[in-house]
Amino acid sequence: MSTSAPLLSRYRQLSPAASIRVSPLCLGAMTFGVSDGEMFGECSKEMAFAILDHFYQQGGNFIDTANGYRAGESEMWLGEWMASRKNRDDIVLATKYAAGYRGHEKNRIQVNYGGTGTKSMRLSVDASLQKLQTSYIDLLYVHWWDYTVSIPELMHALNDLVASGKVHYLGISDSPAWVVSKANQYARDHGLRQFVVYQGLWNAAKRDLERDILPMCLDEGMGLCPYGVLNQGRFRTEEGFRDRDQTNNAGGRNIIPLSEHDRSVSRVLDIVATSKGVPLLQVALAYVMQKAPYVFPIVGVRKVDHLTGVEPAVHISLTDEEVNAIENAYEFDPGFPHTFLSGSMFAQGPPKGGYSPDVVWWTKMLGTFDWVEGAKPIRPQP
């Protein structure tokens, strides 16, 4: 690869179930706006456009937003930017429905402007199309599972949007694995479009997604777009933690408080980063990209230099030893039945998951086997 080539210009297929091609990083647009600034920090329209311009110039084409981000500012600004740059068809645009996107209009009865049902879905999509100044959405997510809509209603209503041309692909976020598997099986059984990508919280300090969501994605042929991969500002060097303590994280996110757990994982990331001569956050980003195939981290920033600081992570290769060092920063418990299958629940030592035939202890008692390995993540190109 030429050293002058844009950092994000080696594209990848989104998932085995979706042929669309996207940049290796997805730009998160929840940071774009001034509404809810006390919780999420502020990013002006001028700065948002500068970030978008840089991302696009580096080859980035995958952008994520939602109907309710920043009281609609995120979608509106994205629409204005694409219209002014005349590049809508270059962009793979993802948005979401389920949030109460008109909550700032206090005079309205809100009950059907949010939720996962058909009316909320159609109203939200039409509003998003208007704000985004486009006739179609590349990827529509169900933002979260609210236990109200039936699987048949959901999948038929979503498929109607695909058939209408308003939506090209379907995704789901922040939902249990059993819901996604059940919905996809229903879709396949009835000739409907299935979910092709999952979005959820995942980073080196928060690995819950690995229990059931990640194995489900691999089995369902789904891609994975993790958010929070940089721990929402809580991965830092010791100097960075001192700065945060002094400023009380002024201007940044203040959703989840900093913990000693964040500090301990950060220390290990810093050790790996120092040994490789790269910034800590690049290692944190490279970690999730090399854990599984079809992983496209969502990175949200409020300044251009925040983005330039992490983009080189797409070319960082971590050794198995470095990945193990990061994961040994704390004890992750996959829980039952995974520890039963691996046999670790019966033994002294750390808990381990059983996600492939080579680690199922009952099987290993029967003989010596050679197994076909599963799909591997793309190795970074230097």
From Swiss-Prot:
Residues that bind substrate: 143
Site feature: Lowers pKa of active site Tyr: 96
Cross-referenced InterPro entries: AKR_Detox_Biosynth (IPR050523), NADP_OxRdtase_dom (IPR023210), NADP_OxRdtase_dom_sf (IPR036812)
This protein's UniProt keywords: NADP, Oxidoreductase
EC number: 1.1.1.-
Pathway noted in the entry: Mycotoxin biosynthesis; aflatoxin biosynthesis
Disulphide bond pairs: none
Residue stretches in coiled coil: none
Function noted in UniProt: Norsolorinic acid reductase; part of the gene cluster that mediates the biosynthesis of aflatoxins, a group of polyketide-derived furanocoumarins, and part of the most toxic and carcinogenic compounds among the known mycotoxins. The four major aflatoxins produced by A.parasiticus are aflatoxin B1 (AFB1), aflatoxin B2 (AFB2), aflatoxin G1 (AFG1) and aflatoxin G2 (AFG2). Within the aflatoxin pathway, the norsolorinic acid reductase aflE may play a role in the conversion of norsolorinic acid (NOR) to averantin (AVN).
Protein name: Norsolorinic acid reductase B
Gene expressing this chain: aflF
